[in-house]
Amino acid sequence: MKKIILSAFTATTLILSNSSIFAAPHTISLGIPQQHTFTEKNEDGSKIEADEPSGYFIGIKFPVGFGLGIDSYKTKFKGDTSKIVTFMYNIFYQFPIPVIDIIIGLGSGKTKLACSACAEDYTDPESGKKTGYKAGEASQWFTSFGIQLTQLIDIHMSYRSVTSKKIEQVFSGTKVNYSGNVRGIGLAFNF
């Protein structure tokens, strides 16, 4: 995944190196997740439901139109104390369109389950077996649409499609799929 991100960044930089985007300002973007939905279902066929996620999205866009970012958020499952914790590194491109901001990007990182019995080294006191979960690799693509409020500030909405199929139970080797979609809002500051 890292090779794909680096190759995409290099190719796009070479293709767009004569574009007017090089005069664009630096931008710092701060966002928060608003909704997290899961594409998989529980073992009984019911939908996996989540409470509102907490965390942040941070992005820094450079004058060349490309940027780097970090996503870090936790989503609590409804009716449970368990959470899924997601951490991603992102690379993105902002199209050079006046007044509106359109961003596309890719991310790579980790997801893990967080609960009292989810730690990788957790041993069930009754059975003596390790029943915890290993953190899994995750990837995402995302897009963001923003509108400038002033020359220095814009407000934006984002959509992330997260693939996370590799959270593995230590004892059984069963892999858990917590892929899904995350929607967020944020502000970007130009300088």
What are these regions (language model features)?
Residues 35-56, 127-135, 165-167:
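Surface-exposed strand-loop-strand hairpins of Gram-negative outer-membrane beta-barrel proteins
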Residues 40-44, 80-82, 116-118, 167-171:
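Outer-membrane beta-barrel and related beta-rich outer-membrane complex signature
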Residues 32, 56-127, 134-139, 147, ...:
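Gram-negative (and chloroplast) outer-membrane scaffold detector with strong preference
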Residues 156-191:
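Hydrophobic secondary-structure block in the mid-to-C-terminal portion of proteins
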Residues 22-27, 46-61, 90-92, 144:
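Secretion/assembly modules of Gram-negative surface proteins
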Residues 1-27:
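Cleavable N-terminal export/targeting peptides
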Residues 23-36, 66:
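Transmembrane beta-strand segments of Gram-negative outer membrane beta-barrel proteins
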Residues 22-25, 96-102, 149-155:
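Short loop/turn motifs that connect adjacent beta-strands in outer-membrane beta-barrel proteins
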